[in-house]
Amino acid sequence: MERLQKQPLTSPGSVSSSRDSSVPGSPSSIVAKMDNQVLGYKDLAAIPKDKAILDIERPDLMIYEPHFTYSLLEHVELPRSRECSLSPKSTSPPPSPEVWAESRTLGIISQASTPRTTGTPRTSLPHFHHPETTRPDSNIYKKPPIYKQRESVGGSPQSKHLIEDLIIESSKFPAAQPPDPNQPAKIETDYWPCPPSLAVVETEWRKRKASRKGAEEEEEEEDDDSEEEIKAIRERQKEELSKVTSNLGKMILKEEMEKSLPIRRKTRSLPDRTPFHTSLHSGTSKSSSLPSYGRTTLSRLQSTEFSPSGSEAGSPGLQNGEGQRGRMDRGNSLPCVLEQKIYPYEMLVVTNKGRTKLPPGVDRMRLERHLSAEDFSRVFAMSPEEFGKLALWKRNELKKKASLF
């Protein structure tokens, strides 16, 4: 009996919402009418969980159906209660708490007095979505991999070997696609990004040379024919002019004789203009038209520091700057054309006591070049060629010892 009193037995009813104007949709405004009883939001939440939710279309309209049957008297009153719940009065605001408590106790007593007939409980309908599983291959996560599908489809080891052969064949083509048979292969096109082959270049060069040779021979034959015609015409003119004995005729004959001289030379008589011949003959042809000091300057642009033994700087006959005209000083872009004057060693010595006044036109960085051969060998105990072969730091050390740095 206590269990029945704790569990409120309600008849099927409807849930309506009387929304307050101030707070629309608040939980306190949701009420339910069951057997002429008005239940609030908290009592709706206290309904046992074994009640089945049949249809949820709106959050404020829920229909509850109990698991037990009702008596004949309750079935007679059922349409009336539903009419009351669907009437416009059902949307009226909830009554006071006193009226609601009295009506609730009366309903509980009436439900307890009626005999309860137990019925078979019905399973509740699920209120969540189940995906369709009509087709077995609809779930992609349960499918085997593609290569296993092919194995299951083929089944035989021959199909497996065929697939492997296809994979190997497709790997030979770019992007695993065979080339279009209508288009030429990439290697057969004219475009080739790499340097040309020497064999191909040589064959093309021979073809061009043969074609040029044939064209030159044809031109020479035409020139020979035209020259013969011109000679014949001039001979006729000479014969006609030789008949004229006046001075005017002699002058015209002289002019024709001058014109008959070979003016142009054929291409075969010209020198070969290959890079090898040009490099060999260009130096002699250019230097022959220049004066002697110009030839020396242009032909010898290396310094005496890098010159081999036996150069002009070390020979006694080319002293006084004769052999040093063509020397190109380190750091200067132009060769030193002016003569290097020779001074005695005492005039070139630099002392630490005071700044020594050097002679005008002296290279302060290379004072040893203004020494004579005898003074150079006496100061440095070596020839200028040997001094030039030394390292820079070694030369500077020797010049410091000799007070020339």
Curated annotation (Swiss-Prot):
Keywords: Actin capping, Actin-binding, Cell membrane, Cell projection, Cytoplasm, Cytoskeleton, Disulfide bond, Membrane, Phosphoprotein, Repeat, Tumor suppressor. Expressed in platelets. Isoform 1 and isoform 2 are expressed in mature erythrocytes (at protein level). Residues 1-29, 81-100, 108-332 are annotated as: Disordered. Its main location: cytoplasm. GO terms for biological process: actin cytoskeleton organization; actin filament bundle assembly; actin filament capping; cellular response to cAMP; endoplasmic reticulum tubular network organization; erythrocyte development; negative regulation of cell-substrate adhesion; negative regulation of focal adhesion assembly. Residues 224-308 are annotated as: Interaction with RASGRF2. Phosphorylated. Phosphorylation at Ser-403 by PKA causes the C-terminal headpiece domain to associate with the N-terminal core domain, and leads to the inhibition of its actin bundling activity. The modification Phosphoserine is found at residues 16, 18, 26, 92, 96, 110, 113, 156, 226, 269, 279, 289, 303, 315, 333, 372, 383, 403. GO terms for molecular function: actin binding; signaling receptor binding; spectrin binding. The modification Phosphothreonine is found at T114. Membrane-cytoskeleton-associated protein with F-actin-binding activity that induces F-actin bundles formation and stabilization. Its F-actin-bundling activity is reversibly regulated upon its phosphorylation by the cAMP-dependent protein kinase A (PKA). Binds to the erythrocyte membrane glucose transporter-1 SLC2A1/GLUT1, and hence stabilizes and attaches the spectrin-actin network to the erythrocytic plasma membrane. Plays a role in maintaining the functional integrity of PKA-activated erythrocyte shape and the membrane mechanical properties. Monomeric (isoform 2); under reducing conditions. Self-associates. Exists under oxidizing condition as a trimer of two isoforms 2 and isoform 1 linked by disulfide bonds. Found in a complex with DMTN, F-actin and spectrin. Found in a complex with ADD2, DMTN and SLC2A1. Interacts with F-actin, ITPKB and spectrin. Isoform 2 interacts with SLC2A1 (via C-terminus cytoplasmic region). Interacts with RASGRF2. This is Dematin.
